[in-house]
Amino acid sequence: MSIEAIVKEFSAVAANPKGQLKAYKDAGKKCIGVMPYYAPEELVYAAGMMPFGMWGSNSKTIQRAKEYCATFYCTIAQLDLEMLLDGTMDLLDGVITPTICDTLRPMSQNIRVAMSEKLPCIFLAHPQNRFADFGKQFCMDQYDHVKGELEKIAGHEIKSEDIAAAIKVYNKSRAARREFVKLASDHCDVIDPIMRSAVLKAAWFMDKAEYTEKLNALNAELKALPAAKWNGVKVVTSGIICDNPVLLKVFKDNNVAIAADDVAHESRAFRTDASEESDPMMALVEQFTNTDYDVLLYDPQSSKNRRGEFVANMVKESGAQGLVLFMQQFCDPEEMEFPYLKKALDAAGIPFIKLGVDQQMRDFGQAATAIQAFADVLSVQ
C-alpha cells in the first residue's frame, strides 16, 4: 500500500473518532474512555476491551458542560464532559478519569456526578512522589483499583499473563511511533505537519496491534524513500496538544516542518516503555515512575531546570532551528513553567514563539501571522 493510501486511512480515523467507536461496538467490543494523562491503557486492553482516547474536540462548542465547569477549566477537559453529555460518547462502557492536574481533579467528580446514571467512572490518582517506595505502593493501589473496576465492566478477571501480553503489544506500538516521528522528520517533504498529526492521533482510537501493523507498513515505505530535499525550516513543537488541521496547515503553507515534539498528546505519551521482564502490574507502576521531563509531573530536582534543558537539547539534537510552544489556555502547569523553559531556551540560544491555543478557537489569523514571521526569521539564520 502506498504512503498516501496508508496516511489517508489514519486521517479518516483521526477525523471521525465517533465512527471508529461505533465500529468497535458493532464488532462486539466494550470500549473504555481514557482521559489524559498516563492512564494504564494496558489494563483495558488486557481485559479484552478497547481503550478510547478522550482529548477534547476541535469541532464542538461548549454548552452543557458550562453547568458543571468553572470558566477557567481548560477546553480539553470541558469538551470531554461536553461529549459525554451530548451523546457523542454514549457508546462507551466506562471512562477512566486521571487527576494529575488541578483541572482534572475536580473534573473527575463533575463527570462522576453527570454520568452517575449513564456509565461507570473509574477514578485514578497518580502519585506525584512517584520515586519512593511509598509512591510506588500508592500507584500500585490505584492501578489495582482501576483493574478491579475494569473487571466489573468486562465481567471477568484480568489475568497477569493478559497484562504481560498487553504490555508487549503497547511497547511495540510505542517503538513504532517513536520510529515514525524520526522518519517524519527525515522525510518532511512527504509527511507534512497535518499528516504527521493525523498518524499519531489515530493511535488513540485504534486497537494498538492493528494500528502498529499499519504504522510499521508506513514506516517501511518511508525508509525506502531517498533523502529529503527540504528547503524550508524545522521546529520542535511543545505543549499539551496541537492537532488542529487548520492551524497545522499554517505550518505547511509556510514550509515549516516538525522535527520532533514535546507534546503530551504525541511523543510524551509513548516515550517510556514498560518492562517485559518483571511482574506486569509492577511494570506498569515503574513505567509511570520512569516517566520524566514532563511539566505535569513533580521533579524533586526542579531547581536544576532539568526539563527546560531537556527541551532545549531536543531542539539541538533534532536538527530544528527553533521551537513553537502551544500554550493551552488556563493550563496552570504550563503557565507556571514557562519562565523556566524560556530561561533554558534563551541560555541555549534557541529562538522560540509562544502561541496561546484553545479548542474553541476557529480564527487562527494571529497565530498564522506569528508563525509566518517566525519562519521568515528562521530561514535567514
Question: What positions do the PLM features span?
Answer:
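Metallocofactor- and cofactor-centric catalytic cores in central/energy metabolism, strongly enriched
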Residues: S11-K25, G33-E42, T61-K66, C74-Q78
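Short, charged, surface-exposed secondary-structure boundary motifs
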Residues: K60-C69, F131-G135, S267-A274, D363-Q366
